[in-house]
Amino acid sequence: MRIQTERFGVLDVPDEAVIRFPQGIPGFPQEKAFVLLPCAEADAFAFLQSIMTPPLAFLLVTPFAFFPDYNAPIHIEQVRHIGIDENNLGEIWTIVTVPDNYHDMTTNLLAPLVINRKKGEAAQVVLEKTNYTTKHRLYPASASTEANGKGGG
């Protein structure tokens, strides 16, 4: 399949690489088909590119690269419809927000994406009874301050 993207131009994507979100993504219910594109600069990052909407691409991160103790209490019932079970736990990614200063990037640990590549389906799951929020910093605040030239010294 050939898709047009704003960020990456025209891409040839094998049909088996398409990841479907049967229930859409909150805020984007009409967007149900994406492709996961690795970020060449950093293994922990990838882009989730919409098949239908060329400008729509989410930056994702594997949360364990920045939060090794991340424990997403996902109930199998929340993701069974995409083929996740005790024998196939899938992959966990989180959506990143990138402000003007990339040192201020945050990720949404409260609502991870669970991807079942074997089945080509995924879901965004909102965690319950957790202290995670939608805005966890990827880099310490001191990195942002130094990048802006406001560090003490």
From Swiss-Prot:
Keyword Cytoplasm among record annotations: yes
Location(s), subcellular: Cytoplasm
Domain of life (superkingdom): Bacteria
Record's signal peptide: none
Keyword check for Cytoplasm: yes
Transmembrane residue ranges: none
Quaternary structure, from the entry: Interacts with translational regulator CsrA and flagellin(s).
Function: Acts as an anti-CsrA protein, binds CsrA and prevents it from repressing translation of its target genes, one of which is flagellin. Binds to flagellin and participates in the assembly of the flagellum.
Recorded family membership: Belongs to the FliW family.
Protein name: Flagellar assembly factor FliW
Taxonomic lineage: Bacteria, Bacillati, Bacillota, Clostridia, Eubacteriales
